[in-house]
């Protein structure tokens, strides 16, 4: 059974261009909570997506939808998923673990902007790009309606930022 850390290290090892977002990013930034899905914003270029697909396959993650994972490479099909099905993520799931990988199909912050402000967090020698606390707050505050876990994340992120400002 693989863990979220193994998935992060595998994405790094395959030289995928990604930024960790969502609940895992909150945890890596200091928020205490449980989560089983890894939300990542990736560069939607064929070579990078192919690396992501290889990483998922290597960890025996399969698409949640009954379609070949290679469909993720088709920009027109991704757009159709967003328009016709209001799809926000493309999910890879495990048959032997509750963990999953969510590839964000749409995000209010561009990859380049997110990456520029990302914090590089060292996980077993792998420098993992993690969405900044400020960007996480921006996204969490934009969720309508906010879920209970989003409200808690907002409170904790604001407290962490206030603590950082006090300690300089």
Tell me the role of every PLM-derived stretch:
Residues 1-168:
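Compositionally biased terminal segments of proteins
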């Amino acid at each position: 059974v693989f863990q979220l850390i193994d998935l992060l290290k595998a994405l790094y090892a395959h030289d995928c261009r990604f930024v960790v977002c969502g609940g895992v990013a909150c945890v890596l930034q200091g928020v205490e909570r449980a989560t089983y899905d890894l939300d990542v914003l990736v560069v939607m270029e064929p070579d990078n997506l192919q690396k992501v697909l290889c990483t998922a396959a290597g960890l025996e993650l399969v698409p949640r939808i009954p379609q070949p994972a290679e469909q993720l490479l088709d920009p027109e099909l991704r757009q159709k998923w967003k328009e016709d099905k209001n799809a926000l993520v493309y999910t890879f799931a495990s048959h032997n673990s509750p963990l999953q990988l969510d590839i964000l199909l749409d995000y209010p912050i561009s990859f380049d902007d997110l990456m520029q402000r990302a914090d590089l967090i060292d996980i077993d020698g792998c420098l993992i790009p993690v969405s900044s606390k400020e960007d996480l707050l921006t996204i969490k505050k934009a969720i309508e309606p906010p879920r209970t876990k989003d409200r808690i994340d907002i409170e904790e992120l604001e407290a962490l930022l206030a603590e950082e400002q006090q300690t300089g």
